[in-house]
């Protein structure tokens, strides 16, 4: 069993508040009581956020289309996104560039990465994750320095540890494997892709605030 009793109780409480709509990861993140949330993420095997589709299936909450996705390459891809190691937000920024506001790109150019990277780190205090002392120092980083950072950190590690879903492609900085070209058009995958990115960034900053 993945979800412990506290997590299940919270899930159904939040689902009732949402008029019986299946909660997203972000719904749960925002609405779970703190003790229950911390209990949920304390042990990997009980952390529903690292295996949300499996959790929904276990609880009888997965619809037929999501079940097909879960048992196919799309489900494997989403699980990689849920579980990839994350010491900083860098990987999530690259994933945001792929996500492209719901119009998923199969490959990223320098410009694709720079646009999302600079926008993300210019927002609020996100620039602090780059290890600079001030916002002015952030503004002084050149495009080539940003790209070097992206290449040697998130891009390198996604290529190495992305279970083959992230690949090199001539003329691009990084690409998705061809086996994903059809599934990335799925509204269900798009929904979960965006939800995972938003949750993982939110959880990262929650942890960092303590």
Question: At which residue positions do the language-model features occur?
Answer:
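Intrinsically disordered, charged low-complexity linkers and terminal tails
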Residues: 1-210
């Amino acid at each position: 069993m993945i979800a412990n009793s506290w997590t299940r109780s919270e899930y159904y409480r939040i689902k009732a508040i949402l008029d019986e709509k299946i909660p997203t990861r972000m719904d749960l993140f925002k609405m779970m009581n703190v003790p229950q949330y911390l209990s949920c993420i304390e042990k990997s095997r009980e952390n529903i956020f690292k295996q949300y589709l499996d959790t929904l299936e276990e609880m009888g909450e997965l619809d037929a289309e999501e079940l097909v996705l879960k048992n196919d390459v799309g489900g494997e891809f989403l699980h990689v996104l849920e579980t990839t190691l994350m010491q900083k937000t860098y990987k999530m920024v690259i994933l945001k560039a792929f996500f492209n506001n719901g119009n998923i790109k199969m490959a990223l150019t320098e410009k694709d990465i720079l646009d999302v990277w600079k926008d993300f780190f210019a927002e609020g205090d996100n620039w602090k994750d780059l290890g600079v002392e001030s916002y002015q120092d952030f503004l002084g980083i050149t495009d080539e320095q940003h790209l070097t950072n992206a290449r040697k950190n998130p891009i390198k590690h996604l290529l190495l540890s992305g279970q083959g879903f992230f690949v090199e492609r001539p003329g691009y900085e990084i690409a998705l494997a061809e086996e994903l070209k059809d599934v990335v058009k799925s509204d269900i995958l798009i929904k979960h892709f965006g939800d995972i990115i938003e949750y993982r960034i939110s959880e990262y900053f929650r942890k960092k605030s303590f």
